[in-house]
């Protein structure tokens, strides 16, 4: 049987933006982001407000990503989601949705480290992606205190 390709739904909910992207093999078909502007009035992200907004945004964002990609959820081959680091309540919304949908569709679920994704996303472009040569050194900044350990693990 010939390989027909792989559709992946990627879900991001680590802080205050709810995002979903659909990829076909190495091409990004859609990328939909719902911003949470409510935090501007507080001078920073309020975790409780962020998780509540994710609950409101996750279904419309994923529906929009699938529609923009021109596929149905039944065509998905796998679901990837942010497992951390990030705000616990926000992460729980994304991970719970991803786990439920993957179970309902009986497709694989892939947990993704947020900081690894920041680093590796630079290798994706509209024409596909060029694989990095491992090991490599990367530097990233985050408010998380344990990020240094995670980056070292990726680069080994």
Mark where each language-model region is:
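Short, basic and Ser/Thr-rich N-terminal targeting/leader segments
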Residues: 4, 14-17, 132-134, 142
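Short Gly/Thr/Asp-enriched flexible loops that form oxyanion-binding sites at enzyme active sites
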Residues: 81-106, 124-125
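Conserved small/polar residues in nucleotide/adenosyl-binding loops
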Residues: 144-151
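Conserved phosphate-binding catalytic cores of ATP/NTP-utilizing and phosphoryl-transfer enzymes
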Residues: 1-4, 107-136
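Short glycine-aspartate micro-motif
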Residues: 8-10, 78-80, 90, 131, ...
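N-terminal beta-alpha supersecondary unit
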Residues: 5-75, 81-85, 114
